[in-house]
Amino acid sequence: MKFVDEAVVKVQAGDGGSGVVSFWREKFITKGGPDGGDGGDGGDVYIQADENLNTLIDYRFQRFYEAERGENGRGGNCTGKRGKDITLRVPVGTRAVDIHTNEIVAEVAEHGKKVMVAKGGWHGLGNTRFKSSVNRAPRQRTLGTKGEIREIRLELLLLADVGMLGLPNAGKSTFIRAVSAAKPKVADYPFTTLIPSLGVVSVVPEKSFVVADIPGLIEGAADGAGLGIRFLKHLERCRVLLHMIDIMPIDQSDPIQNALTIIDELEQYSEKLAGKPRWLVFNKTDLMPEEEANEKIQEILDALGWEDEYFKISAINRNGTKELCYKLADFMENLPREEEEVAEEDKVNFMWDDYHKDAIAGKDVITEEDDDDWDDCDDEDDDGHVVYVRD
């Protein structure tokens, strides 16, 4: 199945049902009290994480989703039925972003988590709500409100422990093939990797971790150049980054400048991502004598002012890869997972939050005098309910 990690959809919550003006009528009771019921609330729109999904391709074909409208109220103090909610199933790790405000509306990082992205409209109030000691036969009601409409961008962020980054042809895909069962395409031309790939590395049966390989970065990636910027988001949940450096590039470029380019693009993209633990991995050490390779590596370390972890490997020959994987497993075992910020769910900014309070106070109320369709009844009407409904 084609890997799709981004899709734009329009979601519309259901409108609220309107309240009704109604009075009880039966034999010998010609002037019964008000019994108009409230409308039903509109249905909400949710997204829910499903571990059985791994792509957003379904949302490339259907772009509009609408929840059910609430029913109008009825006589006899009957409340309208609430509109049915609608739930969009998405892969674990998906977030929803409002395309107009760029606000993260929802994020689902574990299976079964369900978050609202559009709120249904409030129900309208029937005339029973307006009965008081001075108003025994109220002819007021309120209309249901409109459901919220949002255009959201669904973004899938892969869940991996280790993220790999570097220039094209640095050897990232070769490394992931060497240490896991993943088989990304490998060739001697740039941008062989076009989509992210995941590989599970099992050091010992009880120790394993997931590695994410993304397309290579180039200068200007933070401004949209190349393919890497589109996929950098997949590294946001990684616990450690491996910066792969080719010490003998096939285009004879300067490894020092190449390393600085990656660091610069990383910092421009996200300070949080740039602040994650990052190890330097010098690849293709088999292409030159050991002494010359060590001198080259030391030259790069000095130029970068690097004092943290670094490793020398040859991914194609698997030299040094086993030791690196053991180091990664031990590091992550001792590194506590970042605690997700437990924040209260963002309150949906909805224009009708105070609707009912305003209605009882006399605002936003529909009266029969305002309703072109109302038809007053005479006292001789004594059979059943008399209901006034605005179309």
From Swiss-Prot:
Residue span(s) of domain OBG-type G: 160-333
Main location: cytoplasm
EC number(s) reported in the record: 3.6.5.-
Region (Disordered): 367-391
Induction: Induced in a dose-dependent manner by UV irradiation (at protein level).
Keyword line: Cytoplasm, GTP-binding, Hydrolase, Magnesium, Metal-binding, Nucleotide-binding
GO annotation (BP), single: ribosome biogenesis
Residues of the Obg domain: 1-159
Assembly and binders: Monomer.
Record's function text: Overexpression protects cells against UV damage. An essential GTPase which binds GTP, GDP and possibly (p)ppGpp with moderate affinity, with high nucleotide exchange rates and a fairly low GTP hydrolysis rate. Plays a role in control of the cell cycle, stress response, ribosome biogenesis and in those bacteria that undergo differentiation, in morphogenesis control.
Protein name: GTPase Obg/CgtA
The encoding gene: cgtA
